Every structure is written in structure tokens, then in C-alpha cells.
């Protein structure tokens, strides 16, 4: 009898497997490229393609707000980071608007030396260039630093009581 063969178990129990998949999908959409073993990448690929398709459904102009909210909530079941969800719906889905699948690709690398396991790279097919990604991250960090600095100066001016002479 062939039982327990519908899901790739990845040598983990259900909770650990789900956490692994969610974290790797989040990393894929955040960095647009991840490196891992072939078995994990094949599982992650199918989940990622489904999430991109779900995000693309929100690009339809006459879609009801309830359906848009439902799509976003379904994606947020897998991706817990709100910034990554926003990136998926506003940036990644628009890049793949004209494609009907094949949003990701798995590239094979040389087997890992320590345990000889098959390693590969999973990446989005229409990736932004590395220089553009680094520039965007730097701008984001600078904006966050500026906001923190303004917050600190506001706290200092509020917390220092005026001295009596």
C-alpha cells in the first residue's frame, strides 16, 4: 500500500515543514533568489507560483474589494512579513502580469562537498538587477535612519525639563 505519498515530507514533521516553507517563500520574495537543496526548492517553487498567481488576480481593475482582501489574506497565511506581501502584490505581480506561469526557475549547482547533496538556486525569472536592489535597500535604510533620528530628537526635546534660575 502506498500511503503518505501526496506530500514531500522533507524529513520533517508538519509544523516544521510548514514553517520551513513559509520562511523560504518569504526569503524568495524578499531577495528574489534563494539557495538550498533541490528537494526543498522543488517544493518551494510550487507554493511560490501559486502565491504569485493569487497576487496577480488582484491586478484586475473591476475586482470587488472583498475578493482583493480575501486574496491578500490567503497570501498572508503563508507570508507573515507585511513588507514582503506589499512587494508581492505591488511589484512582483505587476512584473508577471503578462505571463501565465513559469514565474520561477531552478538552477542546478555543484553538489555540496560536505554531504554530496544536490544544491540549487531558485529565482524569479524577471529579477531586478543586483545594483537596483542594493540601491533600493540603501535608500530604505537611509529613510529609516532619518526617521529614527527625528524620533530621538523629538524625545530629547520633550523629556528635558526647563531649569529654573
Swiss-Prot record:
Q: What segments bear the compositional bias annotation Basic and acidic residues?
A: 138-158
- Region described as Disordered: 138-165
Q: Which GO terms describe its cellular component?
A: cytosolic large ribosomal subunit
Assigned keywords, A-Z: Ribonucleoprotein, Ribosomal protein
GO terms of biological process kind: translation
GO molecular function, a single term: structural constituent of ribosome
Kindly name one Pfam family recorded for this protein.
Ribosomal_L17
Kinase listed as a keyword: no
Family as reported in the entry's similarity comment: Belongs to the bacterial ribosomal protein bL17 family.
- Subunit field text: Part of the 50S ribosomal subunit. Contacts protein L32.
The protein depicted here goes by the name Large ribosomal subunit protein bL17
GN (gene name): rplQ
